[in-house]
Regions:
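Long, low-hydrophobicity, solvent-exposed regions enriched in small/turn-prone and acidic residues
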Residues: 1-325
Length: 325
């Protein structure tokens, strides 16, 4: 049926009783006979319990007043969340509670972010050993991530103002060479007695060149992100099984001509005792059309064999920075 070839996604964000919520829904077909089976969705409802923001060690109420680049910005917060998923990937039905603790630090050339999430939920989904098996289990545990980003070289000695020469970008690119570091850990316990835990760590470079103003090869973005893993145990559920091998993640984006950019993302298996050692996986190929007012992305996922279409609109408050084009 022709209607099976038409699909769409929607994201709804807003507030309910002054609390933040979002719904992300996919409709894989608009065929009315298959409508129920084609729907997948997840939602989050977040209530802030505590938040403190400091600029140069002074408490502030409005984070819009960050001040000059020399300012030191710090923020602490605690959120309570309710979440749920339906027919999403390897999940049939999922619901739970989470407590989110966060810390953010920003100073010129250096950022640090830390998150700790405590989670309790009930999940029904495919088994990790037998995909035909549907398991229904309670799960509790935590995940934590520490990320650091340090700018080694700044290619923007003289910061540029946004003007009518930026035809292919809605903002000024932050150019330079960074070192990104990440340490993460997590552990889950399941109601059938199984458990899993993992520690991940890695340090890698990020390079951004060009202004995306000129027509030919005026933007390059390249990131290498190694992840070295140590894992113990495994999940009985397929959807949340922690990655069990070390890998190197490549991400590359290059302007070809005018608004046309190409992108490539993939992971290289670094686990020498793994049967897929030395092979690329999760390969994605992207084509971008980037303009000041909008962008169009087409991404082909080789493993899943699908094409993702994304359309963004920018700068609703645009004030005649450039003539029509």
């Amino acid at each position: 049926d022709f209607l099976d070839y038409i699909a769409f996604s929607t994201i709804i964000e807003g507030k309910i009783f002054k609390e933040d919520f979002n719904i992300n829904a996919d409709f894989k077909s608009i065929n009315p006979d298959k409508f129920y089976d084609s729907i997948s969705a997840d939602f989050n409802l977040i209530k802030n319990l505590y938040r403190r923001t400091f600029i140069n060690k002074k408490k502030v109420k409005d984070i819009c007043d960050k001040g000059p680049d020399e300012s030191t910005f710090e923020e602490y917060w605690v959120d309570m969340g309710v979440y749920g998923s339906f027919n999403r990937g390897d999940i049939y039905l999922s619901k739970g509670l989470k407590l989110i603790n966060g810390y953010s630090f920003l100073k010129k050339g250096f950022t640090k972010n830390y998150d700790l999430i405590l989670d309790y939920g009930h999940h029904k989904g495919k088994g990790s050993i037998d995909n035909s098996q549907l398991l229904s289990l309670n799960r509790y545990g935590f995940t934590s991530v520490l990320r650091n980003k340090f700018k080694l070289i700044d290619f923007d000695k003289y910061k540029k103002e946004y003007d009518n020469s930026f035809r292919y970008s809605p903002n000024v690119n932050d150019k330079g060479l960074w070192i990104n570091g990440k340490i993460s850990t997590g552990a889950y316990q399941y109601s059938n007695g199984l458990s899993q835990s993992v520690i991940q760590a890695g340090v890698g470079p990020e390079l951004v060149l060009g202004n995306l103003k000129n027509k030919f090869l005026d933007f390059t973005s390249f990131t290498l992100t190694p992840e070295f893993n140590y894992k113990k145990g495994f999940s009985p559920l397929k959807f949340d099984n922690f990655n069990d091998h070390s890998r190197l993640i490549f991400d590359f984006k290059q302007q070809l001509y005018g608004p046309i950019l190409l992108g490539f993302n993939a992971s290289l298996n670094l686990q020498n005792d793994h049967p897929e050692y030395g092979k690329f996986f999760d390969r994605k190929f992207s084509l971008f059309i980037s303009r000041r007012a909008y962008s169009i992305d087409l991404t082909y996922n080789e493993a899943e064999e699908y094409v993702l279409f994304n359309f963004n609109i920018f700068n609703f408050g645009y004030k005649d920075y450039s003539p029509s084009f």
